[in-house]
A protein has these predicted regions:
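Metal-dependent polysaccharide deacetylase catalytic core of the NodB/CE4 family, i.e.
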Residues: 45, 49-51, 57, 100-102, ...
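Alpha-helical scaffolding within the catalytic cores
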Residues: 87-90, 113-117, 145-165, 251-255
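Active-site environment of divalent metal-dependent phosphoester hydrolases
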Residues: 111-113, 176-178, 227-233, 253-256
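N-terminal Lys/Arg-rich, disordered targeting/topogenic segments
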Residues: 1-9
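Extended hydrophobic/aromatic segments used for targeting, binding, or gating
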Residues: 235-272
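N-terminal pre-catalytic segment of deacetylase/amide-hydrolase enzymes
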Residues: 12-102, 264, 268-273, 288
């Protein structure tokens, strides 16, 4: 039955393509339809902090105005923000994705995401994935701060955003987000046995899952690798903990197919400050 539905959808799409380009361009249009049937290209945009202070802007910090401009550009150009559940449904049972899907992500769980990104997403009809560092969420839940410069979201803020239906909470480890110690992110140490590494990584990520379950009512299905670092054997460990979607920091567009493995290590484009929305999306999304 599914094959019949797919064939019907393909024929309808092909007919539309023929009408759109005329007889001269029929062959090229049909090739495009064949390519589209092999999966869906899903660009992923990666943000971190959003701060309304020109002195703080840089590679990992954009201004509220830049973020709103990005959301407006995506809306104006026909993109629809999706979440993990949309990708999983497409892979598992063929539920169609929007014509131009985009996955918007925020790493680390800063309070300024709640302050600026959350209301902006509501205004522009966007959705996004926010992947907090579990330990930071615990710290700022115990001692809340509303400083847009350094504070992180509390569990209550994450719950509010999640319950709105436009924000998905991911896992960014509990306490493996350091770049100034012996271990970079989740990287395995040279002196560490695979058995010890598996135990360490599993304990940390599982703790973040448990904290989310206790405070949000559900455990994340998406894992964002800190710094994009992945050690040998790590993907298997992460998969064993129940994640269906994982995010890298590689600048590329991923093609999502009916193969569950197509949801692993999705490419992402880091959004820096100092570039117009038009220039950034032309550079990263191209013709997608």
């Amino acid at each position: 039955m599914y094959g019949v539905v797919n064939l019907k959808r393909w024929l309808q799409t092909a007919a539309t393509a023929v009408l759109a380009v005329g007889a001269i361009g029929v062959f090229g249009a049909l090739l495009t339809v064949f390519a589209a049937d092999g999966g869906v290209q899903v660009p992923v945009i990666m943000y971190h902090a959003v701060i309304d202070d020109s002195r703080r802007l840089g590679q990992y910090v954009v201004s509220p105005a830049e973020l709103e401009s990005d959301f407006a550009w995506l809306q104006r150009n026909g993109y629809t923000a999706v979440l993990s559940e949309d990708l999983i449904r497409y892979v598992e049972d063929g539920t169609p994705l929007p014509e131009k899907p985009v996955l918007i992500t925020f790493d680390d769980g800063y309070y300024n995401n709640y302050l600026y990104a959350y209301p902006a997403a509501r205004r522009y009809g966007m959705k996004f994935v926010l992947s907090p560092i579990g330990k930071c969420t615990d710290l700022y839940t115990a001692e809340p701060s509303e400083s847009p410069y350094y504070a992180h979201c509390t569990w209550a803020m994450l719950r509010e955003m999640q319950d709105s239906g436009i924000v998905e909470i991911g896992n960014h480890t509990y306490d493996l987000h350091s770049s100034d110690g012996a271990r970079l992110g989740t990287r395995r140490l040279a002196s560490e046995s695979m058995e010890d590494y598996r135990a360490m990584l599993s304990a940390d990520v599982r703790l973040a899952q448990e904290k989310a379950g206790q405070n949000l009512g559900r455990a994340p299905v998406l894992f964002a690798y800190p710094f994009g670092v992945v050690s040998e054997g790590e993907p298997e460990i992460i998969a064993s903990l129940g994640f269906s979607v994982t995010l890298s920091c590689e600048a590329r567009i991923s093609t999502v197919t009916r193969d569950p493995e197509s949801l692993l290590y999705l490419g992402r484009f880091l959004r820096p400050s100092g570039e117009t929305s038009e220039a950034f999306f032309a550079r990263t999304l191209g013709a997608v």
